[in-house]
């Protein structure tokens, strides 16, 4: 670590100690959260545990009535999961790539991210895992698709496999049960790469459209809104015509996407902006309206204006308030609908992988949670499913939750852990 990087980390650490004494004690979570007044940070808080990984015999802690085991291990930064119709499990292995720092704080952030194993050389592949004997542990692994550009979201429609690379959606010929993709891909839509680089995918119920989450380049449009065109949005791609459009906008970093079956509405989890305090604003879970605008970068949680940003009063007036707050800077990424009966003791609701904070005085996230639903809406407080990803002193991270899906048996969850390099399986005890 060079002197300037160390100096920046020391300053960031000092901000942690200074701000911890005035940090809110109550997390901004739920349908009606108590969001503290914004406190603009001249130097952003920088606090993140060093990546350690899991030692043999050590694993996350599970809620009462549940158990957890490693479905697959030895991966290279697993981020997203897709379960195929035959029970095979696809895992996107990708990582934020190192870039030249723009200023002193950026230099410190890059150093912190590398120490946390959140930045480096990306494997750029999709691997296939097969549990042939049904014991909850995969015995077979294949390189399903290689040579991609930070692959993330995946989907299969008929005889086509789709992957969301950071620079666009690519389609490949696919045969059910195949161990690997061998045909040439064709680009369907281009996205601006980098920044918030993940590109999640989900298919409509009728199989005619794909939706893609595309995050912003910057925190609050720092490099100008022209650079943000086509970003901070959810895109809709018509598979028959090839036409693509922005379905919803003003979503700073929409990652996980899921369908809620009662109303048929699309839901997403969104990572909100930095630099306004530990709980301000909270990340959130929300339904997504066609043509809806959700505030970024001008405002948050409805019409709460961010005065760091040149304003657009017409857009602020249109801003839709999210449905459910998930706490400040929890980095809620993974999302799947879990029907009642999947896990004992849990009803209908959304499961959310919280990757964990890096920019607040006290850590938040670093767990897998459940938000109960009734009549198509969140209906109560969140519950923890998995935790124990941090050392007791919070200096080390054993793992970090990311993508989550229903397991092939319909009675389990599979969750990607991109620090432990494991796919965890959660089932009834």
Label every model-predicted segment.
Residues 84-87, 156-158, 203-207, 260-263, ...:
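Residue-level detector of Asp-centered blade-edge/turn motifs that repeat once per structural unit
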Residues 137-159, 165-205, 216-219:
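Asp-box/WD-like beta-propeller blade repeats and closely related beta-sheet repeat scaffolds
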Residues 4-63, 98-102, 106-116, 121-123, ...:
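Beta-propeller domain segments
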Residues 405-429:
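Blade-level signature of beta-propeller repeat domains, shared across WD40, Kelch, NHL, RCC1
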Residues 70-75, 142-148, 188-193, 246-251, ...:
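Surface loop/turn motifs at the tips and blade-to-blade linkers of beta-strand repeat domains
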Residues 78-79, 101-157:
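Blade-loop segments of beta-propeller domains
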